[in-house]
Curated annotation (Swiss-Prot):
Signal peptide: none annotated. InterPro entries: RNA_pol_sigma_r3/r4-like, UPF0251. It comes from the Bacteria. This is UPF0251 protein Cphamn1_1487. Belongs to the UPF0251 family.
């Protein structure tokens, strides 16, 4: 059962790096004979942080810049996909998702909001998401500078 929040875009998730390999498959079976499971880059990052690095969910969520609840959903989705692929003998492809590599955003850009229409910049107010702000110049919605919505690296499904 899919829990898609209709009408609400996925928030940008921070990842340390992109996967070193693009796919895993059962040995001795041609890839074109296998069903494929797509594990998104942010799901793989959640597995890395929680299962490989041993972070608690709250710490891992902070590193990915998502809520603890969102991190839990990402991790649960990844666990189900990976377990299903292992049990049913499917190949896993690591691709897609809404993410940004942590190194792609500078510290000075994290405290700025930018207009998605005219490019006007304003200081980010703590506790107020940029997307909740409107541009004082043209009235359009603002996005976090350096975030996925501001035209930086964005890999979508």
């Amino acid at each position: 059962m899919s829990h898609n929040r209709a009408g609400r875009p996925k928030s940008c998730r921070r990842v340390t790096d992109t996967p070193r390999v693009r796919c895993f498959k059962p040995q001795g079976v041609s890839r074109n004979m296998l069903e494929e499971v797509v594990v998104t880059v942010d799901e793989l990052e959640a597995i890395r942080l929680a299962d490989f690095e041993g972070f608690y969910q709250a710490e891992a969520a902070e590193k990915m810049q998502v809520s603890r609840q969102t991190f839990g959903r990402i991790l649960e989705s990844a666990h189900k996909k990976i377990a299903g692929a292992l049990v049913e003998g499917k190949s896993m492809v690591f691709d897609g998702g809404v993410f940004m590599k942590s190194e792609d955003i500078g510290e000075e850009e994290k405290d700025r909001c930018v207009c998605s229409s005219c490019g006007y910049e304003a200081e980010h107010r703590p506790g107020v998401p940029c997307r909740a702000m409107t541009c004082s110049e043209c009235g359009a919605s603002m996005v976090r500078k350096g975030g996925c919505g501001a035209g930086r690296r964005r890999d979508a499904q």
